[in-house]
């Protein structure tokens, strides 16, 4: 049975549970559960992750934890009973876990690894806390580390900042807003101080280090590597200050044996020291670790003599240094231990040994040398911080290693009480000694002893260095042959304090002989006492000691014999009468120098201090001694502090009147000395002395008297230094006074209490007197007052010991009240006064409610005065923060209500005014980045905001009621409401608190909404009816709107756990404010009309909030607005216009963030079904206009949604452009808002410019230009345009548009604008501008003829599915591709822009299922442009560069073809039933335009019969052959004729092996002719085209014969043989063919009479179809836009012989082979032999859209790119096609090519092909382009650019659009991307859906120096073949055919340019002259003819068609071409 649990309430899942039982709860390991019931080993409860789901789970899967249960029962809550920081770590790690993984996904790898490290650290620290084995200090340290890491992680993950106090999360309800603000500030600073490594070097979290923290260096010697000494060594380590040139620490001594190990075996691994007490100042000094190496052994290392074994000398060996600065830079963390190597150097001259370390540091390399590279000391260093107690506690392992404590010489910066030292540091400086009759100098050794007064040598009183035991004697090191040795060796003398007096030092000097005996001979000594007769010790100075002569026989047993002698010069002056007959005689020529430094807390070197302490010995000198006390150093005073104080008070008791003032001054001096930070730690010593040792019971009287006397004198004295010092010592003076009075009261049982109180009263009167003095003219008095005010708050605690709280408060109030107001004193005094008040508020006195009642009014008075005058705002805010903190803490007390009332009356208004001033200054400062003043910073704004919020939070109903009742008039109330609403608005607009201060921001919002609820009733009550005030109401509404839109209140974007926490604590404050807003709107009544349309935008912003309830509340307001305006104006145009404007501006300003994603659903609710604004509208009289309005706004929102989505993210430019065009059209066509339309024109133009779409940018700006007239009407300033006339603006626009057309190389579009401008300039006689514009126009003509331009590709894209943006959804577009962009690249671009889209694999129109699905489908294939201006393309004399422009510009129609079989399919010849389905697309606008793509407006579908298709295929092939042949016929040298070879080979080879023979079989068959009698004319036409092809091939072979390379002769012979076979196959069908090409006859071997069954050709059949015939004009050739891709046109086939069985069954098979029959040389790059491809060779590709082996680029033969990439051909033909299209097409720009090797049936490549390959590029190399597919990597990459010269550009022509003004009309959206084309640096590209081959560069066509050939087609067929030397056509004219060879020859020789000659039976027509001016662009085009489907084909075939593209002109040939054209034109007229 299930029973409720009593104890088991909370637990952690220790094993995951799948919940496989009924009612089972799925649990993950680590989750926490709340347990409700239990039953036989099972629990029932909920997971804290999903508190709404209850279930059961096994009890043994749960680890129980203690918890606090509140509200037991159904709604009980459980809080785990564990450390709050552990709970926080757990929750934080769970929150970080998901975010951490996202970092990896977003490629933020660095932060990913850092966060992982921190998370692991947190887990470890949490484990330490949970272990329960830590001390309190350790727990505190662990918590500090945890909080630093938590804050660091939250900061870097963008999470909320957590306010803390003592490492615990604070509850915002328990503290004041001011305190909460400071905690946020503190946490933020802590986070900023922590580094990415979570630095632990910063001060403890939440603490301020008042005292400097000492540093310590831990040094450990690892090893000393040396191999040449062979003797024991002493290594001395010390710290050396290079700047000061002195050692600052004791020495650390390590004694090593000759093997480098420690001499003492116990020292192994324990050679370590701690250099202590280094201050921060020391760490900034130029410090070095210096190591001196002293060897112990022979005098000379290389001395072979063996001296006595007992004699060892200390000899200098070497030195090493290490910079502390280098150490600190390498130690990145505190406590990090790191190894360093110190290289040891030896001294070149021993006399300079004392300076060797300086020389090494200075790098004076001439004075030292390195004995060996292997000499070095390896040490490890570690930096520690903190006092010694802390160091011992935190690093116990260090102290367990026999650590040597190495102290600083002298005291540290902070002298700690109880630090007892008595060390004398003696430095052996130098000596000067006589040679003593020797020829060489001496080797001098100094021996030193410490002797007591009785002559006893003191044991263990000499220390050479820490780390080794003390010794009784010291032996210096010996410098070889030096009579003036300089040692510089420091020795420490730790002499016991009781032995110091009477002790002396004796120095004995010996010469160490290097002779055989090696003895040491004594020759002199010196001595020095340690204390003088006056009791002072040896001074810290250099002392010169007298050297006395002696010898080995001299005895020192009787020390009195020499102690009576003077030891130095000072001593000599004290002993004037010294007998000369003493046993020891002074050597006057010898001297010895030592220096001493005393570090003692018991001994002094100061005579004055000794005199004070022994004043009773000389009582008459006491006045003098007290006067000299201030000259004693602070170190001496603090050492003897208690003794000095006792002495002073004894003197005071001895004679108060005589010594009182002097003792008072001395006491003040000592007290102020302890204010120095160096002695600050001695304040506790002083406190202890006062409490326990002070015994001056009568002292208080004299102290009060002196203090009062000082204050009374302050008005008169000019010098007040001593008075100011007394004021600074006020705290301790009062401590002495109070303690003295307590002692007196105890002794006398409280006698003289009244006198004491009276004296204190009088003292305070004097204090008030001092403060009341006018100090404006006296700087001295000002300093005195400042000193008094600074010290005044420190005496409160002392007074509270003697007086009640009220009495002390009265004292303080009187004192603070005596200060002059801020008007009368200077700024510096203001600061001091406020600081005094601040310390008063922070004192214990202010925490009592009794005292606050007394003090608060005077404190508020002073603050009010300062705030009114805007002075010292930062200090005032600190005081207010302290007051609010205290009031919040005491809020349960009854007196707090009264205090809050007092603060409201005094502060609320001035706080609001102050905040407004600060915010306005801050705003102005942001606008003008000038100097920063403290009052304008975010910090001070935050301080005052927190103060205001604290006050408002403390206010209750009563306070608000009193506040509102106290206003004397409505004007005052209005001013107050405006102020507070303005402050609240600024709070939300300025973001005073950072975004991650979520706790602070939520609390602020809660206070604001509560305050507004109180104030809204006053607003309604006072300003509604007759007293309506628009300004107040508007301010209120603006505030409410801002409040609801606050980012911090948008709960939808935060985690569910955080959302629940906020809702539990505050509720949804947006809903609360929305209800207030709606209620106030309803209260407005008829005044609502004042806010229409002004509040439409703000209220609309509120509805953007994705909160259903808020929308519910707000939507009726819109109906209200429409209703009220309808009543007033009879319409609601204003509402409509304003709504549209505001919606647009919100989007443009980027407002709304994520909520805009909800906008569309919002509007369907807002104006659609939701609370049914639409239903309300339908009930009104204005129903129709209302519904129209709703519809328009909904449509606008759809577009704004798309625009917002594109603009805000990392969307591609094409989407942004498309959205902008879409929106622009909407404003123009549907709403007719011209200003918005123009704005979006400029936005679109900017986007085009950014994408470098200059032509589109020009067309876009042209829209605005067309709206303007050439008038002088003034225009206002708009956008970036200044105020100017309409004429000026239009002129500027025209110039800019012309400039953009020039940059876009669209000169034809710019020329009409030039003419328009020229007309204007001419009418104004502005000849300068006219000249400029005419030159510009002329330069454009030059550019058209000379500069190279690329022809773009065009692609049809269908966007299907509901997931696409609105402007693309279920629509199809045609896109103008970028330069060099082929189908595959375009397709990849589209798929990358729509990563969710799926590419459709078929060209069929999608069904409704796809159109309505929630997905994205893309259907992409290439289309062929159908140019509108065919008349330009038909003109013979128009240069090809001009024609090429019209082929791809001003194009509105495009087509693509799909093959299919109609009727029964003939397996023997499938061409009979192969039809073409031709789709023509008509766009809404011509390309190019304002976008790179436009929507398809209309589709037309026609079918092309097999015969018509065959005619087009053969006709196009003939045209290509003529064009190519004409390019080669003018060459006079043997150039590269690969293209001609390939083209001829492809046609002849295909014809021999099937080619046109298939057409003969299909269409010349009797059965076909009989079945299709209507096709007779077409059959005749096909026959004529075949005859023409044979003739053209003959001409081509003649040209080939002329230029063929000798190595290619076999190929040429093969071509001639195959040509004869081809002619023979057609002989019986066309008997006249044998006479067509005699140049090729001779080896004619007819293959068979293929056409024998057909009737002979009629005489008419010999006529050649003119190239301008309707049939010929059906298709056009053109340049491709990409040099990286070759789009195989319909006439392009592959040079592959198809075997009889190679035809497939599908219509695509036949269509494919039809293409192969007539290969196009434009799409081939190599001559290939015949390769039989069977169906089994095809390698199907997986995708016709994405595969590199995609479908052939063209569906039919007549269109150059009509179906590029059409996915209609099956994959199985792709490889075959790529194999056959071997070399790239001709292009007008460089590229690379791909060549698959053709393989014969026997597997061997053909010889001619190999020869050609070698001729072209030598050996072929496999292509290794990583972008290629596996199939392509077997191809060969041939680069023709290396051996071909480039040709010129094709000159384009002028446009055919006009610049007339156009009305506003919609322009379709364009989804094209602005990205540039593919990088041209990649020389090899894979085949693609477009072609399967790469393009060939323009250099394939010979040398640029040659005249550009004409590429027009041949007019007629000559009866005889041409000679190979003759021209096929003259330059610049089409090829003409005559019926006789002589006519041809005559025409060629007689005239370089000839007119058209007509074929037989054709009357020649006059050639059409080119127009004088190019056709004007922009003229409305003729409407397309409407046809029936059956007639359409015929009519279309009769339409003229543009020519195929020609070879480009060479650069620089344009001028020559122009001259020839002019001459040619003249000849034509003649």
Curated annotation (Swiss-Prot):
Positions with biased composition (Polar residues): 1755-1765
Residues covered by the SH3 domain: 6-67
Region Disordered, annotated ranges: 1641-1662, 1734-1771, 1849-1927, 1951-2030
Gene Ontology biological-process annotations: neurotrophin TRK receptor signaling pathway; regulation of small GTPase mediated signal transduction; small GTPase-mediated signal transduction
Protein location: Cytoplasm
Pro residues bias spans: 1967-1977
Keywords: Chromosomal rearrangement, Cytoplasm, Disease variant, Guanine-nucleotide releasing factor, Phosphoprotein, SH3 domain, SH3-binding
Motif (SH3-binding): 1970-1976
Family membership: Belongs to the DOCK family.
Subunit structure: Interacts with presenilin proteins PSEN1 and PSEN2. Interacts with CRK.
Entries under PANTHER family matching the protein: DEDICATOR OF CYTOKINESIS, DEDICATOR OF CYTOKINESIS PROTEIN 3
Domain notes: The DOCKER domain may mediate some GEF activity.
Protein name in the entry: Dedicator of cytokinesis protein 3
Source organism of the structure: Homo sapiens
